[in-house]
A protein has these predicted regions:
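Acidic, glycine-rich low-complexity/disordered segments
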Residues: 19-83, 87-91
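Positively charged n-region of N-terminal signal peptides that target proteins for export
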Residues: 1-4
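Hydrophobic h-region of N-terminal signal peptides that target proteins for export
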Residues: 8-17
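Gram-negative/organellar outer-membrane beta-barrel architecture
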Residues: 80-271, 298, 304, 328-332, ...
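Detector for outer-membrane/organellar transmembrane beta-barrel domains
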Residues: 290, 294-320, 336-370
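Outer-membrane beta-barrel proteins
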Residues: 202-207, 279-287
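Small/polar (Gly/Ser/Thr/Ala-rich) solvent-exposed segments
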Residues: 374-376
Length: 420
């Protein structure tokens, strides 16, 4: 009987010790500590003994997609961090600034030389290089069909440098042509920031032409990717044969926390750009201010998802009325569906979009939408309708049919892209 009682007490003590050990381990795990520990004091209480141990090196797995020097700059912000929670927070910021570092990439940790900590980075990027286009068709008042088009080339990681190139050509109608080119490099030589160059041209026959060039520095912050630089713009109002130009300072922020690069259905996206400078025309110089923003957020509702998408843009010239060249253009698949591409122009615009997504959301999405615009000069009725998106392998397709109170008959918007 005494042996039985002794065995019971020993078993109870072992179980209690295991529970305490598990509790203390979970506390260390919550703190993200690598080398700290709990120590029993003379009062039979556990004291937390913190030992600072910072990450001093990185080791990459699956690094063949990007040059190692680029990877070291991408993940350099985690060096010197002292616990796992700090690293995970920094990794979220890195992913939001460079979305090709998706959830398939993760970090583990290794101890070596007794007191040193290395970050082991399993790098599995998803680069989204593609060529795409846009096709729109609608029936005009004279009964003839009007066709519009766009070509979009997007390249990521050429030459394994982690850079991004965009080339867009657009013809909203028979008289209008647009060209946009940008090149972004994540890091300039060995500096902790990169560069972004943008060229934008816009021409409407017998009306105006306008061209702008931007040069920016880009870098990483806790909120995403920051941007800072300058912009030069020049143009001519062909209707009155008057030239204009401007020089300005530009700042911006971009963060992308969406879950899927082709068909996102969770997370959020935010981008904003502010421009302040001097505008010069035949009346003289004046102050210019421009602002743009985009915000997307996905919310689960049962087996479906609601996309909330807000978009706004404003251009302000002190003591000036905006000519057509400077006004914000909108209408069509990228702004207000149910209308022709760039059918309208205004000094400022705010568009609130709601989409109800359902289906196998990673591969195909059926949706019902409404685009609600608010503009400075007049009233634009909302566009509404339904559509379908699909991604298979390397082919992505976006089709929507939009309606509006203003125009009789619907507008068909088709957008496609193919991976490269």
């Amino acid at each position: 009987m005494r042996i039985f009682k002794l065995m019971t007490l020993i078993s109870f003590g072992i179980i209690q010790a295991q529970e305490i050990d598990s509790l203390l381990y979970s506390k260390l795990y919550e703190k993200g500590e690598w080398k700290s520990f709990y120590q029993l004091n003379k009062n039979n209480e556990f004291d937390f003994v913190q030992i600072n141990s910072r990450i001093d090196s990185m080791y990459f797995i699956h690094q063949h997609n990007v040059e190692k020097s680029v990877l070291k700059h991408l993940f350099k912000p985690i060096l010197g961090l002292s616990n796992q929670n700090q690293v995970e927070g920094q990794l979220i910021a890195i992913k939001s600034a460079y979305p090709f570092i998706n959830d398939g990439s993760f970090i583990s940790f290794a101890k070596y030389d007794k007191n040193r900590i290395a970050a082991v980075i399993d790098f599995n990027p998803v680069f989204k290089s593609q060529i795409g286009g846009l096709l729109g068709a609608s029936k005009g008042k004279d009964g003839d069909w009007i066709t519009t088009g766009e070509i979009d080339v997007h390249l990521e990681n050429p030459r394994k440098k982690g850079s991004v190139m965009d080339l867009k050509w657009k013809q909203p109608d028979a008289f209008t042509r647009k060209l946009y080119f940008s090149l972004e490099t994540p890091f300039l030589f060995s500096l902790p920031f990169g560069t972004l160059f943008q060229l934008d041209q816009n021409f409407i026959e017998k009306n105006y032409h306008i061209e702008s060039f931007s040069g920016l520095l880009v870098g990483l912050s806790h909120f995403g990717q920051w941007r800072f630089g300058g912009k030069k713009e020049s143009g001519k109002d062909l209707s009155i044969n008057e030239r204009f130009n401007s020089e300005s300072v530009l700042i911006g922020l971009k963060t992308d926390k969406r879950n899927n690069r082709w068909l996102p259905h969770s997370g959020q996206f935010f981008e904003t750009v502010l421009t302040l400078g001097k505008f010069n025309d035949y009346l003289g110089k004046t102050t210019m201010f421009e602002s743009k923003f985009k915000f997307q957020k996905y919310k689960d509702i049962g087996n479906s998802v609601i996309l909330i998408y807000s978009k706004g843009e404003r251009i302000f010239l002190n003591s000036r009325k905006l000519n057509l060249a400077k006004k914000v253009k909108f209408g069509g698949i990228n702004t207000v569906r149910g209308y022709n591409e760039d059918q309208f122009a205004s000094e400022w615009i705010f568009i609130q979009t709601f989409e109800w997504l359902f289906g196998d959301l990673d591969q195909s999405q059926s949706f019902i939408f409404i685009d609600i615009p608010a503009v400075s000069d007049y009233t634009i009725h909302p566009g509404y309708g339904l559509g379908f998106r699909q991604y298979k392998g390397t082919i992505a397709l976006d089709i929507s049919i939009g309606f509006s109170k203003r125009d009789a008959g619907g507008k068909i918007h088709i957008k496609f892209s193919s991976g490269l």
